[in-house]
């Protein structure tokens, strides 16, 4: 969508699932708020509605301004290393981003994804910006596309059950969210994580989202901060889930 000379991208919630919840757009908007508090370079998303569906959260959209232009392009990491199997390993990615001066940014992205449990950081959802005229790499692209964060398929209000589900999620970069995030921590990142304690969402930017869900995700962030700092698995911090996460998950099927 073009507006006032700028290009905006609109993304709807998943309509293909059996029970479309509309949470993906809100997940994107919540992740955007968290990113603003934690990341240096990120794409900003906000919630918008079409006029005829203004009161239906399930018909929400997330909107962002395009981060590319005629002079600056984006190349996916997966396209850069299409024939290199080893390039999909976290250490290989870290080495690549270090080679273009973006090691700190990549480390932060991994910790951010663990904080919000973003399950969709595939090889096309990160990469580099380049000069369209010279093809010179300008740096790592800003963090974008976070609609699979904050468990968009979970529609309950029970925190322990949610964490039992969360304990079964896998990162797309490595298998273990918190193991990878803990591995890439630096002293600076530890300070940044500790400074996030007490994080609260701006409710005015999440119109229509129940307060109960917002509080669930704020508690999730608090638990993930402590788990990442300790290197503990998702849901294992005392007061942040159950000690028998798999058994609790099994009960959801009854």
Q: Where does each model-flagged region fall?
A:
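Conserved ATP-binding subdomain of kinase catalytic cores across diverse folds
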Residues: 1-77
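Short, low-complexity, polar/charged sequence segments that are solvent-exposed and flexible
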Residues: 29-32, 81-85, 160-163
């Amino acid at each position: 969508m073009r507006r006032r000379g700028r290009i905006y991208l609109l993304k709807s919630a998943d309509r293909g699932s059996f029970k479309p919840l509309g949470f993906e757009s809100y997940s994107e908007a919540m992740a955007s708020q968290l990113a603003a508090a934690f990341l240096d370079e990120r794409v900003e998303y906000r919630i918008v509605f079409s006029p005829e569906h203004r009161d239906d959260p399930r018909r929400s959209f997330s909107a962002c301004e395009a981060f590319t232009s005629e002079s600056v392009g984006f190349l996916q990491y997966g396209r850069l290393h299409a024939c290199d199997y080893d390039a999909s390993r976290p250490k290989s990615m870290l080495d690549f981003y270090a080679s273009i001066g973006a090691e700190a940014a990549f480390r932060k992205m991994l910790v951010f994804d663990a904080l919000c449990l973003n399950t969709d950081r595939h090889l096309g959802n990160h990469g580099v910006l380049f000069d369209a005229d010279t093809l010179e790499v300008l740096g790592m692209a800003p963090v974008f596309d976070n609609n699979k964060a904050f468990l968009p398929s979970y529609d309950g209000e029970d925190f322990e059950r949610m964490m039992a589900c969360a304990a079964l999620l896998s990162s797309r970069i490595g298998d273990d969210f918190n193991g990878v995030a803990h591995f890439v921590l630096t002293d600076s990142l530890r300070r940044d994580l500790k400074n996030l304690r007490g994080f609260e969402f701006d409710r005015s930017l999440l119109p229509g989202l129940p307060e109960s869900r917002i509080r669930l995700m704020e508690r999730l962030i608090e638990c993930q901060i402590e788990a990442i700092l300790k290197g503990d698995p998702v849901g294992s911090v005392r007061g942040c889930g159950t000690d028998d996460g798999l058994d609790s998950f099994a009960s959801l099927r009854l």
